[in-house]
A protein has these predicted regions:
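N-terminal amphipathic/basic-hydrophobic helices that include classical n-h-c signal peptides
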Residues: 1-19
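Intrinsic low-complexity, intrinsically disordered segments enriched in polar/basic residues
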Residues: 12-17, 63, 100-103
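RNase H-like nuclease fold core
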Residues: 18-62, 66, 73-80, 148, ...
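RNase H catalytic domain
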Residues: 25-35, 69-145, 149, 154, ...
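Short, mixed-charge aromatic SLiMs
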Residues: 92-93, 170-176
Length: 176
């Protein structure tokens, strides 16, 4: 892939050269809501890492968003230049069109997934993140790989509980 060299000054004002970090993500939930998972491919220079995790009961959008969060949380140096490639219009439009910043101002009133959006904003601020949308299932090799990782993770025998989602759908219990 293309190699982009970027230069930043660190605290000691010495010149640092580092490579662009490419992140590919995908989320899946069968039944939506249902068992779900996310898949991540991270590439920087010769470095490549794949991550995936499955959950018992969640939504497609939560998995798409969680994939981006988890990937960004792996990055050690603050201020890294990152390109996130995703097929999720939900995630990309919410950030690129600035909706999520308005939701935050209004305390995420009547908005879904506030737990994940708050976690996203915390890590998003630390880096220089750009987004690129790709059409899903369109023979984009890294995106296809993420899809396979996400689906495979969602079918694992030991799945985690998506606590944030479970909390959000709990019905308030009436007084007996």
């Amino acid at each position: 892939g293309p190699r982009t060299e970027l230069f930043t000054r660190d605290q000691n004002n010495s010149l640092n050269s580092f490579r662009m970090i490419y992140i590919y993500t995908d989320g899946a939930a069968s039944g939506n809501p249902g068992p779900g998972g996310y898949g991540i491919v991270m590439i920087s220079g010769k470095y490549r890492r794949e991550l995936a995790e499955g959950f018992t009961f969640t939504t497609n959008n939560r998995m798409e968003l969680l994939a981006v969060i988890v990937a960004l949380e792996q990055i050690k140096s603050p201020g890294s230049a990152v390109l996130v490639t995703s097929d999720s219009k939900y995630v990309i439009d919410s950030v690129v069109k600035g909706w999520v910043f308005n939701w935050l101002k209004k305390g995420f009133k009547d908005k879904k997934n506030p737990d994940l959006w708050r976690r996203f904003l915390k890590i998003y601020k630390k880096h220089n993140v750009k987004f690129e949308w790709v059409k899903g299932h369109n023979n984009h090799p890294e995106n296809e790989r993420c899809d396979a990782l996400a689906v495979h993770a969602s079918k694992a025998t030991k799945l985690k509980v998506d606590k944030g989602y479970q909390e959000s759908i709990k019905k308030p219990k009436g007084l007996l």
